[in-house]
Regions:
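Alpha-helical segments flanking ligand/cofactor-binding loops in enzyme cores
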Residues: 107, 201, 265-266
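Short alpha-helix within the catalytic core of nucleotide-sugar-dependent glycosyltransferases
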Residues: 103-110
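C-terminal active-site subregion of NodB/CE4 polysaccharide deacetylases
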Residues: 1-94, 100-102, 206, 223-297
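Metal-dependent polysaccharide deacetylase catalytic core of the NodB/CE4 family, i.e.
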Residues: 35-41, 110-258, 292-293
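Generic enzyme active-site microenvironment
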Residues: 94-95, 212
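Short active-site segment of divalent metal-dependent hydrolases/proteases
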Residues: 99-100, 217
Length: 297
């Protein structure tokens, strides 16, 4: 908690505390750091681990603009980067969850000409009147029931997935009403207003913005059966292509060590992902695992 608070108030100090700035950068700038934002606000902060005040965001981006080399994901290639000799420390900005607050604060990124990746949980951005929009909200709600966050037998999850995928729209609406009433450990993403599909398509044409996948329903990918996992990845990639997004980037939902394994990484690789991001604090170096890159945030 202390590190997260410092990260949002004293950005440069935090980089030093996490050993993500000098001495590494003073010796060789062929490292870079990836920053992970979630939500922005100009009101009282309710969750200091995920929200950043608009004024603080402005100060952070001003610092980055003056002292660092912001990486443009539209043209990034790690081989070219590590062959180069950057004269400043480099940084890549990412934002998880496609929260509507991005749109309200985009002017600050434009002010400092800072490129960014928005990682989108596509199913939660679809209208709840659509099949995949309803399915994703039901799957999200399933994991907001405490007992389903524990070790649940694979057959239970598999059968639940099969039931949802074979249900009619009317049946899905009834299931959603019922499962919503059972939620007793609601995730913050379910209380946020996310960008809708049309807004994502519009933003994808912005010169500073790259749209990429964050799955469909934002589950811990290692906790779902293989067929469910495949749906989370392949369906999100289909919607990603519809909004002119970039499939080579992906952010793991939650992103802690146990949310990533070889099966998930292999499926991402097969779907064109070259760079996948966790939430673990690590610099990106030439010998990094590019399907398990670290981020600060």
């Amino acid at each position: 908690m202390k590190i997260n608070l410092l990260a949002r108030k004293y950005f440069s100090i935090t980089l030093n505390l996490l050993n993500l700035a000098p001495p590494f950068w003073l010796k060789d700038f062929r490292y870079f750091v990836v920053v992970d934002y979630h939500y922005f606000t100009d009101n009282k902060i309710s969750d200091p681990t995920l929200e950043v005040d608009r004024l603080i965001l402005d100060k952070q981006l001003e610092f980055i603009s003056n002292n660092m080399n912001p990486i443009n994901p539209k043209s990034f290639d790690h081989k070219a980067f590590f062959r180069s000799k950057p004269i400043k420390p480099s940084i890549l900005i990412t934002i998880d969850d496609a929260d509507f607050s991005i749109k309200r604060n985009l002017d600050i990124f434009e002010k400092y000409n800072i490129p960014l990746i928005i990682f989108v949980p596509f199913g939660l951005c679809l209208a709840p009147s659509t099949y995949d929009g309803l399915r994703s909200r039901i799957f999200r709600s399933f994991f907001e029931i405490k007992e389903n966050q524990q070790e649940v037998e694979g057959d239970i999850k598999f059968n639940f997935f099969e039931k949802i995928m074979s249900s009619s729209l009317e049946e899905l609406e009834e299931i959603y009403i019922e499962i919503k009433s059972k939620r007793n450990n609601k995730d913050i993403i379910s209380s946020r207003t996310l960008l809708n599909f049309d807004e994502l398509e519009e933003l994808s044409h912005h010169p500073l913005i790259t749209i990429s996948s964050h799955s469909m329903s934002h589950p811990v990918l290692t906790q779902v059966p293989k067929k469910w996992l495949m749906w989370e990845i392949t369906s999100s990639m289909q919607y990603l292509r519809k909004v002119n997004g970039d499939e080579k980037y992906f952010a793991y939902p939650y992103g802690y060590k146990g949310s990533i394994n070889g099966e998930v990484k292999e499926l991402l690789r097969k779907n064109g992902v070259k760079y996948a991001f966790s939430t673990r604090s690590k610099t990106v170096k030439m010998n990094s695992d590019f399907l398990e890159l670290g981020r600060v945030g």
